[in-house]
């Protein structure tokens, strides 16, 4: 057997908690205010490798609560858009560039999570899942999926990818946030099933835990999409530096050539939507 030892939990000033000092935190009150999963996720994310002491304040649990809200809201959006979806697995022949990107990122996340589990890097697991779900799945893929869902040719497979990535994300989050993930997972199961090859278990807690799978590795496409995301971020930064209202569209010129120009041509609709761009023209690099 193995024993996991974490650092001493101190108050926000770094002092040892004690009833005589009146600086203790009652977990029951935290659960009442922020929720059980928020408490679990926050404390997990604060675990440092090496057993350093942990400073905790009441406000820090807002981090876990906000993430739980993000999971809930994103899941509601996905479920609202699963209407009419079949119970088939993802059609690999119909994957778009951004579909391959999110599947690759999910695959890499599963690898990192499993590797960290072996080393008992509990805090790293929480941060990895937070960054993937909030930034890559919600902020990028879900926003682009809204565009693909409007295309009759892409809708069905986009629904399958949305569902699959959410399913795998819930499985990885479940050990940390068991209550919200189980409820969402059961709702998805009732609405559409999972389009999975495996027999779907009765509960998330006994579902297979995601592992790295070479089948979902798309490193080239991931690199190409990262170029697109950096371009969108740059356009947003330029807009902000010139105080251009978020409601206003702008015309842009992108200087690129060769393979990169082909990539931008494939995902031009995403740039229009996410960077509030009207017309895009291309010029060769000087």
Would you name each region that the model predicts?
Residues 49-52:
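Transmembrane helix-loop junctions at the membrane interface of multipass transporters and ion channels
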Residues 1-32, 55, 59-286:
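Feature 926 captures the class I aminoacyl-tRNA synthetase adenylation module centered on the KMSKS loop
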Residues 41-42:
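Non-catalytic, structured segments within soluble enzyme domains
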Residues 45:
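Structured mid-domain segments that build the active-site/substrate or prosthetic-cofactor binding neighborhood
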């Amino acid at each position: 057997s193995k024993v996991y030892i974490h650092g001493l939990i101190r108050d926000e000033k770094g002092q040892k908690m004690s009833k005589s000092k009146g600086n203790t935190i009652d977990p029951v009150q935290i659960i009442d205010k922020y929720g059980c999963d928020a408490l679990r996720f926050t404390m997990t994310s604060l675990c440092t490798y090496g057993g350093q002491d942990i400073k905790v304040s009441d406000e820090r649990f807002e981090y876990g609560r906000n993430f739980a809200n993000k999971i809930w809201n994103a899941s509601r959006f996905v479920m609202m858009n699963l209407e009419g979806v079949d119970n088939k697995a993802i059609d690999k022949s119909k994957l778009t560039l951004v579909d391959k990107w999110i599947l690759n990122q999910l695959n890499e996340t599963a690898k990192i999570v499993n590797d960290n589990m072996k080393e008992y890097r509990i805090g790293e697991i929480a941060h990895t899942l937070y960054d993937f779900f909030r930034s890559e799945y919600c902020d990028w893929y879900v926003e682009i999926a809204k565009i693909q869902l409007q295309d009759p040719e892409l809708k069905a497979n986009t629904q399958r990818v949305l569902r699959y990535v959410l399913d795998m994300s819930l499985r990885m989050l479940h050990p940390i946030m068991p209550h919200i993930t189980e409820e969402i997972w059961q709702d998805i199961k009732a609405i559409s099933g999972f389009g999975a090859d495996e027999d779907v278990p009765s509960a998330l807690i006994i579902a297979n835990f995601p592992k790295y799978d070479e089948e979902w590795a798309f490193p080239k496409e991931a690199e190409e999409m990262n170029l697109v995301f950096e371009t969108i971020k740059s356009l947003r930064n330029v807009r902000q530096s010139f105080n251009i209202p978020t409601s206003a569209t702008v015309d842009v010129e992108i200087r690129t050539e060769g393979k990169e120009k082909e990539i931008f041509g494939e995902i031009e609709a995403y740039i229009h939507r996410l960077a509030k761009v009207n017309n895009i023209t291309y010029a060769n690099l000087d």
